[in-house]
Amino acid sequence: MIAIGLEGSANKLGVGIMLHPEDGSTPRVLANIRHTYVSPPGEGFLPKDTARHHRSWVVKLVKRALREARISVRDVDCICFTKGPGMGAPLQSVAVAARMLSLLWGKELVGVNHCVGHIEMGRLITGSTNPVVLYVSGGNTQVIAYSSQRYRIFGETLDIAVGNCLDRFARTLHISNDPAPGYNIEQLAKKGKQLVDLPYTVKGMDCSFSGILAAIDGLAASYGLNGEEKEEEGAGDDSKPTRADLCFSLQETVFSMLVEITERAMAHVGSKEVLIVGGVGCNERLQEMMGIMARDRGGSVHATDERFCIDNGIMIAQAGLLAYKTGFRTPLKESTCTQRFRTDDVFVKWRD
């Protein structure tokens, strides 16, 4: 079976084509194409602008994916799209494209939960069996474990997502959004040496990032670092934190919180595996810190590279095809988007 997946819940538009061989052998990625809407430094991406980007690129990416996969429309069994969670306008633009292709090609639709897509793609690529999942991105921060055909949320952010915290601080510093603000924060943090004290907020298996963001924004303003970088920054005063120091401190603090709640979930469910998914999961420092914790517990950490960590269409095709093979379909009249589509709302029929 072959599925085409369309992802557009935020600023990345992805089209992926996945093959599940009839003999039950390992699924194959036939195409995985992505195009990103990049806003100017110091600015986020507005839903209307992002949706306009997706509408203008989706047909081009679908055609390119079909060429790369070397298949025709006749070979496609179903069209999978992100039903939620995500930003309303971008989600809607991709859902409209999926409906159009469904009607044009006469193919059935499968609405996919974005978070479940990340989990299933991570499981496929890494070969992890039943891990505790840390899902970290610009819009979500959740600690998840599978039980009784649901991906249960054991802990999550109480306010903003960790990726949103990092992205918004990048705006404060006027760091470039190309290729991604979080990536540029990570590169700057590697140069940091001074650890600045920041709030640390963990409640059980939940955490909060808004207070940390407010605190570090205030520090950046007090040291004159909130704006475009000046040539004289960091010169002459070794006691004054630099941009790199602030990025380093922010990463160390928020990642320590994530490691703590993940370890607590591992102890609760008795797992020795951690799977990190979502865009922030690409961060090498997060993977390193999580690895130290897991090794101390006699466990292991699984993560993917940017092809599969960052939002992509192939994860939607993978999760959609798993659901499609169990008989799941999304009727045209129900092919709407749900911005707050919870991970544990999905009945995971394809797992025991």
From Swiss-Prot:
Cofactor(s) this protein requires: a divalent metal cation
What catalytic activity does the UniProt entry give for this protein? L-threonylcarbamoyladenylate + adenosine(37) in tRNA = N(6)-L-threonylcarbamoyladenosine(37) in tRNA + AMP + H(+)
User: Could you tell me the keywords of this UniProt record?
Assistant: Activator, Acyltransferase, Cytoplasm, Metal-binding, Nucleus, Transcription, Transcription regulation, Transferase, tRNA processing
Q: What is its main location?
A: cytoplasm
The entry marks the following residues as binding substrate, namely Y135, V136, S137, G138, G139, D167, G182, E186, N283
| Annotated a divalent metal cation binding sites | H114, H118, Y135, D311
Q: Where in the cell is it found?
A: Cytoplasm; Nucleus
Q: Could you give a GO molecular-function term held by this entry?
A: N(6)-L-threonylcarbamoyladenine synthase activity
Q: How is the cofactor bound?
A: Binds 1 divalent metal cation per subunit.
Which Pfam families does the record cross-reference, listed alphabetically? TsaD
CDD domains linked: ASKHA_NBD_OSGEP_like_euk
The EC number(s) this enzyme carries: 2.3.1.234
The role this protein plays is: Component of the EKC/KEOPS complex that is required for the formation of a threonylcarbamoyl group on adenosine at position 37 (t(6)A37) in tRNAs that read codons beginning with adenine. The complex is probably involved in the transfer of the threonylcarbamoyl moiety of threonylcarbamoyl-AMP (TC-AMP) to the N6 group of A37. Kae1 likely plays a direct catalytic role in this reaction, but requires other protein(s) of the complex to fulfill this activity. The EKC/KEOPS complex also promotes both telomere uncapping and telomere elongation.
- Quaternary arrangement and interactors, per the entry? Component of the EKC/KEOPS complex composed of at least bud32, cgi121, gon7, kae1 and pcc1; the whole complex dimerizes.
Task: Tell me which family the UniProt entry assigns to this protein.
Answer: Belongs to the KAE1 / TsaD family.
Q: What is this protein called?
A: tRNA N6-adenosine threonylcarbamoyltransferase
Q: Give the originating organism.
A: Aspergillus fumigatus (strain ATCC MYA-4609 / CBS 101355 / FGSC A1100 / Af293)
